[in-house]
Amino acid sequence: MAVSYNYGTGRRKTAVARVFIKPGSGNIVVNGKPVDEFFSRETGRMIVRQPLVLTENDSRFDIMVNVTGGGESGQAGAVRHGITRALIEYDAELKPVLRKAGFVTRDAREVERKKVGFRKARRRKQFSKR
């Protein structure tokens, strides 16, 4: 008999996470590494576990994640978004709780592009009067 996974795609900045959850003991594997090894900062690990802690499912699921693009912060946010979506697919009654905490909404903030004639996105060249 095949094990049934629940799937969720999470995105944040330029990072994309594909999250698969199945009933288990609470193991979280990101790109083949344990979550504590993959995310070197404690904040990244905390962000990833937030939806599970909120819904009190931190030791009920084994989670397998593939994440690409972005940096450490963006990837952590993408994984959180993916876990949230997978939990909702598993049990739709969790949606209002997760929505209230703000985990369901995709954080649409992206890096603003650099403009021609500027040093950065908004930083202009220094003005010289003479």
Swiss-Prot record:
Is Zinc tagged as a keyword? Answer: no
Q: Which GO terms describe its molecular function?
A: RNA binding; structural constituent of ribosome
Q: Does the keyword Ribosomal protein apply?
A: yes
- Intrachain disulfide bonds: none
**One GO process term, biological-process aspect:** translation
Going by the UniProt record, its keywords in alphabetical order are:
Ribonucleoprotein, Ribosomal protein
User: What GO cellular component term, any one, is given?
Assistant: cytosolic small ribosomal subunit
Q: Which domain of life is it from?
A: Bacteria
Stored Pfam families: Ribosomal_S9
The family note in this entry says:
Belongs to the universal ribosomal protein uS9 family.
Its recorded name reads: Small ribosomal subunit protein uS9
